[in-house]
């Protein structure tokens, strides 16, 4: 048994048993719950109005990590930063490139919790190549609105028969279940990454560059058009630029990346004065 004070408005459980008790109590009293992790995305969309808040920031930690088997199992409140630091030790990554919205809303890094990342299904530039967050979830445990435990999947890629619930809860914004544990596929980091910076293209030309590049056999892993009115804020490595630009990223083994960058430059018909390579 746990000793929770149900008169408080913010619950900060440290165990799954406490989460179950909180949800069951709120269900019996018909009290809606707002679910929070590290609040990195609470300024996105319409705020949820509720009497009680379930704060999962103390329900954190890496449960299991097997680099050789390419998976990590974590509690939902675990900071993304902590997971990335652990993966860095083995030159591995979350290939879907989770976003860091902290700079946008608070001016400092706050990449949030892994539960928030999965609940929102927000992926980065590599999404068109490797898939979204839901494509990297091997399994999960969660608690539904009645306080019942739900389990799906496991720790290997082909571990689901029937409907894959991981696909359903990813991007559900906490409306279907409170995620408690997640098993996630990890992948090796690319050996090299280079970015083609094309200077001052107008919008139509930039879209043409991106369309050709992303459908090219050079296999880019990211692309973006950066309008000129953002130019004053642009800094990438040592490059500063005060006009519009298009950036196209290529990753992989060093020799392969060099060859593909050169080939893509030729395919796009770029002159040396029009581009930089970072």
Model-identified regions with their sequence ranges:
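Noncatalytic alpha-helical scaffold of FAD-dependent oxidoreductases
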Residues: 1-278
């Amino acid at each position: 048994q746990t000793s929770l004070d149900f008169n408080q408005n913010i619950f900060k459980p440290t165990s799954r048993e406490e989460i179950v008790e909180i949800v069951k109590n709120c269900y019996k009293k018909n009290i809606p719950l707002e679910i929070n992790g590290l609040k990195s995305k609470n300024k996105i969309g319409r705020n949820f109005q509720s009497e009680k808040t379930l704060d999962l920031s103390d329900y954190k930690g890496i449960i299991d990590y097997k680099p050789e088997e390419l998976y990590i199992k974590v509690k939902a409140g675990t900071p993304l930063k902590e997971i990335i630091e652990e993966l860095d030790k083995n030159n591995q990554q979350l290939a879907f490139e989770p976003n860091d919205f902290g700079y946008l809303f608070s001016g400092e890094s706050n990449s949030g919790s892994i539960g928030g990342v999965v609940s929102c299904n927000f992926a980065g530039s590599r999404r068109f190549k490797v898939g979204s967050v839901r494509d990297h979830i091997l399994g999960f445990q969660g608690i539904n609105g009645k306080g019942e435990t739900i389990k799906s999947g496991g720790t290997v890629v082909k571990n689901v028969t029937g409907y894959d619930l991981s696909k359903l809860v990813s991007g559900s914004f906490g409306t279907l279940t409170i995620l408690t544990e997640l098993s996630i596929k990890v992948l090796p980091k690319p050996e090299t990454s280079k970015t083609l910076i094309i200077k001052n293209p107008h919008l139509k030309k930039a879209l043409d560059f991106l369309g050709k590049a992303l459908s090219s056999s050079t296999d880019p892993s990211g692309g973006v058009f950066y309008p000129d009115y953002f130019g004053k804020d642009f800094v990438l490595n040592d490059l500063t630029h005060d006009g519009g630009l298009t950036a196209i990223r290529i990753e992989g083994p060093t020799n392969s990346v060099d060859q593909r960058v050169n080939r893509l430059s030729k395919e796009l018909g770029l002159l040396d004065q029009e581009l930089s390579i970072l």
